[in-house]
Amino acid sequence: MPTINQLVRKERKKVLEKSKSPALKNCPQRRGVCTRVYTTTPKKPNSALRKVAKVRLTSGFEVISYIGGEGHNLQEHSIVLVRGGRVKDLPGVKYHIVRGALDTAGVAKRTVSRSKYGAKRPKAAAK
């Protein structure tokens, strides 16, 4: 515990909060260009082929982003919108690609949680 004199000489340091998505530079989303689209395997207890893309952002960073949903139309040079949000079982993947924005198509035949996957509302079934 510092004395009053010590506090007068040197004030307390503020605890700085570290950003979880530094490549976005305090923006909600960033535009980028896919440099590589590939699949990778998750950490130990899980098993799958997760779809990811390496994206060069307008902020100058090159990040690995997760492509959510079933199926996608992304390839090299696709323009994508990237948001924050990590994937727990993929080390180094701290960003998500926004479905239904720019070159990324929404998920086809999606009826639940459509807004998260860029899917339009289906037409009412004919009676």
From Swiss-Prot:
The 3-methylthioaspartic acid modification is found at 89
GO CC terms = small ribosomal subunit
Check the record and name the InterPro entries matching this protein.
NA-bd_OB-fold, Ribosomal_uS12, Ribosomal_uS12_bac
Q: What keywords appear on the UniProt entry?
A: Methylation, Ribonucleoprotein, Ribosomal protein, RNA-binding, rRNA-binding, tRNA-binding
SUPFAM superfamilies per the UniProt record, alphabetical: Nucleic acid-binding proteins
Tell me the Pfam families matching this sequence.
Ribosom_S12_S23
Task: List the GO molecular function terms.
Answer: rRNA binding; structural constituent of ribosome; tRNA binding
What is the official name of this protein in its record? Answer: Small ribosomal subunit protein uS12
Q: What is the species of this protein?
A: Campylobacter lari (strain RM2100 / D67 / ATCC BAA-1060)
Taxonomic path? Bacteria, Pseudomonadati, Campylobacterota, Epsilonproteobacteria, Campylobacterales
